[in-house]
Amino acid sequence: MIPPTDPRLVDAACAAVRGARRVTVLSGAGLSTDSGIPDFRGPNGVWTRDPAAERASTLACYLAEPEVRRAAWRNRVRWFAREPRPNDGHRAIVALERRGVLRGVVTQNVDGLHQRAGNDPSLVHEVHGSILATRCWGCGERRPMTEALERVAAGDADPPCLACGGILKSDTILFGQSLDEEVMAAALAASEDCDVLLTVGSTLSVYPAANCVPRARAAGARVVIVNGEATEMDHLAEVVLVASLSAVLPAICAA
């Protein structure tokens, strides 16, 4: 359970953002829980409740085990059936862009909700990829996820690439898979070129995305952390706020 929010910490976070000319946001799974998407490591997270699911999130396991792929496709069908929508936390970050102070959004999320809320896609750096597309592990062809899901609905439990017959996966980064170097470089650049790094909904335990925090701090940025629980980077932050993101972000970003 999230403890009562200290209004003094909310005021401190508001003041930090209010005084910034360039704000970079680093977002994690906790931002999207109010959109009905469970996080991974929280008290009710996917991997907390089912540790075996974390093993199934490795690239080696996905490529080697057809049943893991079939289960992944079933999960993707369920994910899209939820029709997740942006929440007040996502919309608060859009408000930063409309104020003209948003340097960029570095997101560990794969749900596309920042763009759907209204953020300029060119400002959103999806370091862990996107579930809205598929990519063939063989030829690299990228296609809309909806095309593959139509094939799953028609009875193909593990649809192969139509171009080469290779293994198809969501265009997301699994454990053991390299990140896109250009996307990560852009994410680090946004973190080093801001007055305030506002991290929201991340435990800051997954690298290299978590490196954005010390890189921003080393470049002179103030770090504000808002999350539903303590993070591994709290010691680097000027303000640490344990709170419901959709409840406090509108005030912080409208400062």
Regions found by a protein language model. Name each.
Residues 1-255:
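Conserved catalytic core of sirtuin-type NAD+-dependent deacylases
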